[in-house]
UniProtKB/Swiss-Prot annotation:
Source organism of the structure: Bos taurus
The encoding gene: PARK7
Reaction(s) catalysed (UniProt annotation): N(omega)-(1-hydroxy-2-oxopropyl)-L-arginyl-[protein] + H2O = lactate + L-arginyl-[protein] + H(+); N(6)-(1-hydroxy-2-oxopropyl)-L-lysyl-[protein] + H2O = lactate + L-lysyl-[protein] + H(+); S-(1-hydroxy-2-oxopropyl)-L-cysteinyl-[protein] + H2O = lactate + L-cysteinyl-[protein] + H(+); N(omega)-(1-hydroxy-2-oxoethyl)-L-arginyl-[protein] + H2O = L-arginyl-[protein] + glycolate + H(+)
Residues found modified as Cysteine sulfinic acid (-SO2H): C106
Modified residues (N-acetylalanine): A2
Protein's UniProt name: Parkinson disease protein 7 homolog
Lineage per the UniProt record: Eukaryota, Metazoa, Chordata, Craniata, Vertebrata
Residues bearing PTM N6-succinyllysine: K182
Record PTM: Sumoylated on Lys-130 by PIAS2 or PIAS4; which is essential for cell-growth promoting activity and transforming activity.
Length: 189
């Protein structure tokens, strides 16, 4: 069986923990992760001035698809950049059409709203993004730290990044693998 594949879309202003933790956890689980720079392959300055080097440009990574999951990190500016991107819209629409998993954290779910993805789903976001996400009646809101409704998986913020990442692993490769990855991380239960 071929290993599962993940596309993490990295935009300027993305939240560092919400990018790096899911990438790390998915790679520990044997998922082939591509970090794709929205604006190209150049290093990306994140919300707290950490710089991350993408594996590929989004344009190049798109050619290597499809992916089992598309991941959207949060960060206000990062989410805004994802929301304004026609390329992100195209990738998300394609992922939704082929019934692939879409995972977004913190302010990242606002890009789902902007691109009309997963309407009717139950979602969660960072508390500061709730009002924007609930503008209209496109989603129902959950206060859960991680919420999965069908093929839409959302989470609340930096402090839920491990839970979010482990849920992606569980969905893609199973709870047993997620538990094996979790054990050496020494997370609080």
């Amino acid at each position: 069986m071929a290993s599962k594949r993940a596309l993490v879309i990295l935009a300027k202003g993305a939240e560092e923990m919400e990018t790096v933790i899911p990438v790390d956890v998915m790679r520990r689980a044997g998922i082939k992760v591509t970090v794709a720079g929205l604006a190209g392959k150049d290093p990306v300055q994140c919300s707290r001035d950490v710089v991350i080097c993408p594996d590929a440009s989004l344009e190049d990574a798109k050619k290597e698809g499809p992916y089992d999951v598309v991941v959207l990190p949060g960060g206000n500016l990062g989410a805004q950049n994802l929301s304004e991107s026609a390329a992100v819209k195209e990738i998300l629409k394609e992922q939704e059409k082929r019934k692939g998993l879409i995972a977004a954290i913190c302010a990242g779910p606002t890009a789902l709203l902007a691109h009309e993805i997963g309407f009717g789903s139950k979602v969660t976001t960072h508390p500061l993004a709730k009002d924007k996400m609930m503008n209209g009646s496109h989603y129902s809101y959950s206060e859960n730290r991680v919420e999965k409704d069908g093929l839409i998986l959302t989470s609340r913020g930096p402090g839920t990044s491990f839970e979010f990442a482990l849920k992606i692993v569980e969905v893609l490769v199973g709870k047993e693998v997620a538990d094996q990855v979790k054990a050496p991380l020494v997370l609080k239960d």
